[in-house]
């Protein structure tokens, strides 16, 4: 393995030469720019910057307050407004309404077929008798694998 110093020696020499300060007449040159390269800041811009910084520093606190209010409001358990059966999990009221409408449609369908004698009754074959468990075909399909029963009105 070669030593890296001979390869970098010209670069090191140029770097040291550029960093070397050559003494001048002893008086410092007049400053064209402000010291340390800093620009003179307009007081209005400084006030605007400080105001924006204060606004952004308060934002995490506001977000935390909103989060606390959200948790306080939604983490409390509420008593249901409807009677809940022990055998069924609580569902959204619209899901309950849809099940009622489906059962109402099923009750109304045979009556409509009897009133209109010209309509032919159609028997729908079931694909697999084990999947229906003795229930008729559904006009409303519940979600999450739950069955619609008329017991939980």
Swiss-Prot record:
It is found in: Secreted. The modification Asparagine amide is found at residue 144. Its main location: secreted. PROSITE patterns: NMU (PS00967). InterPro entries: Neuromedin-U_amidation-site, NmS. Residues 27-69, 70-105, 106-108, 147-153 form a propeptide. GO terms for cellular component: extracellular region. GO terms for biological process: locomotor rhythm; neuropeptide signaling pathway. One of its GO terms (molecular function) is G protein-coupled receptor binding. Keywords: Amidation, Cleavage on pair of basic residues, Neuropeptide, Secreted, Signal. Residues 1-26 form the signal peptide. Implicated in the regulation of circadian rhythms through autocrine and/or paracrine actions. Belongs to the NmU family. This is Neuromedin-S. It comes from Mus musculus (Mouse).
């Amino acid at each position: 393995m070669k030593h890296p110093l001979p390869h970098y020696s010209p670069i090191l020499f140029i770097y040291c030469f550029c960093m070397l300060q050559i003494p001048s007449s002893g008086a410092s040159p007049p400053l064209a720019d402000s010291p340390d390269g800093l620009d003179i800041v307009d007081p209005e811009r400084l006030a605007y910057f400080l105001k924006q910084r204060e606004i952004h520093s308060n934002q995490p606190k506001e977000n935390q307050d909103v989060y606390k209010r959200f948790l306080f409001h939604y983490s409390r358990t509420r008593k249901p407004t409807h009677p809940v059966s022990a055998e069924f999990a609580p569902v959204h009221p619209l899901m309950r309404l849809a099940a009622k409408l489906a059962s109402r449609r099923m009750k109304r369908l045979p009556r409509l077929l009897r009133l209109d004698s010209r309509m032919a009754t159609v028997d729908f074959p079931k694909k697999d008798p084990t999947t229906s468990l003795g229930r008729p075909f559904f006009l409303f399909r519940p979600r999450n694998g739950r069955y619609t029963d008329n017991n939980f009105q």
